[in-house]
Amino acid sequence: MTFPGDTAVLVLAAGPGTRMRSDTPKVLHTLAGRSMLSHVLHAIAKLAPQRLIVVLGHDHQRIAPLVGELADTLGRTIDVALQDRPLGTGHAVLCGLSALPDDYAGNVVVTSGDTPLLDADTLADLIATHRAVSAAVTVLTTTLDDPFGYGRILRTQDHGVMAIVEQTDATPSQREIREVNAGVYAFDIAALRSALSRLSSNNAQQELYLTDVIAILRSDGQTVHASHVDDSALVAGVNNRVQLAQLASELNRRVVAAHQLAGVTVVDPATTWIDVDVTIGRDTVIHPGTQLLGRTQIGGRCVVGPDTTLTDVAVGDGASVVRTHGSSSSIGDGAAVGPFTYLRPGTALGADGKLGAFVEVKNSTIGTGTKVPHLTYVGDADIGEYSNIGASSVFVNYDGTSKRRTTVGSHVRTGSDTMFVAPVTIGDGAYTGAGTVVREDVPPGALAVSAGPQRNIENWVQRKRPGSPAAQASKRASEMACQQPTQPPDADQTP
């Protein structure tokens, strides 16, 4: 499914978006992991138009570099045209056409950069209808319960399109009309250029309205056609943050439903958020409160959630990830993570490994079958296969000026509360005792113990904390011990 070879597309993204009340350009606000402009350009690129032009104005210095990045991502050329003065949508189209050769002949599709749910099928149907009826212009329309802010479609008695009147110029009776302009058009370029040359700014906003082209072409006796879109969300625009949230919710509903229809169990779609670039394998179960963001990849037969957020994380088949926050990490097949686990960028957990409760890992590789069950920080480390890291262990990776790495071999067992002061290497099959501070390398098969014999300082509390609750308690315990009768030796025992 592609556009005909003589089709160019203009994307209007020059408006300031003042109703967003934001320092971020409107078209760069995101939903489902992409900016609004990115959603639109992805949809258009699927149809491979001959030319694709984005018209920028306000904050063009911030938007243009991102358009370049999207062009690289999509593997095609995207031209940028500049509207240096905000003189209306008609003027914006004139600026966009300046990027085309004067002798360009064909069709031009015009759409907006703030319609994030617009899809390739809708655009393909538009151009197919436009060509089938040989229209000078075909405009997409839809019907809204609340049409405030949209241009109204004025029809003739025989239901032909007579004109589009903007909200600010509409009469009270015209504002009652619920069929609105979706802001997506297909034009014959010669007819478009002719009509644009006759636009007037004699209106409430003193701008050149693209919508006035409809009445001009009709008065010329040319064919003006309208194609109604029943699913209004596909052509809904965003002017404020309320509408952004509404469309984000609607897009998420559609993304979640698509995964469900593909064989993924989503227990509670209302509390599950999945970005458009996320992939999930069959028979995976997603529990409530889960967010799968960026380019996260979930294998088949996994269990994810509840209360889990993964951003750009790759999860292998059959893995379990529960109450975990992770980013830019990988989890191997059959591995178990959580609950209350923090995976920072650069974490790689091998197949059948385990990262348990209150474990934080950063920039570390953890081998197949290795377990870090609980209460541990692993930073800048490489751990081999089938090792076990005891509770409350810490990989001490920062010396105050730089990060150092620790290497732990395979089949290693470390006691609780082991401190690995990097850089150190623990050989294969080595052990550490509880409370050990490892400052030097441990040879393979060795037991590292750093603590000396325990030493008890008698009556320390009475001397250092006299009168304290601890001193009083210890005094009572000593007195009770003194009152205990001493058992005489058993008469039958031989001295």
Swiss-Prot record:
Keywords: Acyltransferase, Cell shape, Cell wall biogenesis/degradation, Cytoplasm, Magnesium, Metal-binding, Multifunctional enzyme, Nucleotidyltransferase, Peptidoglycan synthesis, Repeat, Transferase. Residues 483-495 have a biased composition (Low complexity). Its EC number is 2.7.7.23, 2.3.1.157. Residues 457-495 are annotated as: Disordered. It is found in: Cytoplasm. Pathway: Nucleotide-sugar biosynthesis; UDP-N-acetyl-alpha-D-glucosamine biosynthesis; N-acetyl-alpha-D-glucosamine 1-phosphate from alpha-D-glucosamine 6-phosphate (route II): step 2/2; Nucleotide-sugar biosynthesis; UDP-N-acetyl-alpha-D-glucosamine biosynthesis; UDP-N-acetyl-alpha-D-glucosamine from N-acetyl-alpha-D-glucosamine 1-phosphate: step 1/1; Bacterial outer membrane biogenesis; LPS lipid A biosynthesis. Residues 263-495 are annotated as: N-acetyltransferase. Signal peptide: none annotated. It catalyses: alpha-D-glucosamine 1-phosphate + acetyl-CoA = N-acetyl-alpha-D-glucosamine 1-phosphate + CoA + H(+); N-acetyl-alpha-D-glucosamine 1-phosphate + UTP + H(+) = UDP-N-acetyl-alpha-D-glucosamine + diphosphate. Acetyl-CoA binds at A391, N397, Y398, S416, A434. Residues 1-241 are annotated as: Pyrophosphorylase. One of its GO terms (molecular function) is magnesium ion binding. Its cofactor is Mg(2+). It is an enzyme of class 2 (transferase). The active site is at H374. Residues 242-262 are annotated as: Linker. CDD domains: GT2_GlmU_N_bac, LbH_GlmU_C. Mg(2+) binds at D114, N239. It comes from the Bacteria. UDP-N-acetyl-alpha-D-glucosamine binds at residues 12-15, 26, 83, 88-89, 112-114, 151, 166, 181, 239, 344, 362, 377, 388. Gene3D superfamilies: Hexapeptide repeat proteins, Spore Coat Polysaccharide Biosynthesis Protein SpsA, Chain A. One of its GO terms (biological process) is lipid A biosynthetic process. In the N-terminal section; belongs to the N-acetylglucosamine-1-phosphate uridyltransferase family. PANTHER family: BIFUNCTIONAL PROTEIN GLMU, NUCLEOTIDYL TRANSFERASE. Catalyzes the last two sequential reactions in the de novo biosynthetic pathway for UDP-N-acetylglucosamine (UDP-GlcNAc). The C-terminal domain catalyzes the transfer of acetyl group from acetyl coenzyme A to glucosamine-1-phosphate (GlcN-1-P) to produce N-acetylglucosamine-1-phosphate (GlcNAc-1-P), which is converted into UDP-GlcNAc by the transfer of uridine 5-monophosphate (from uridine 5-triphosphate), a reaction catalyzed by the N-terminal domain. This is Bifunctional protein GlmU. It comes from Mycobacterium bovis (strain ATCC BAA-935 / AF2122/97).
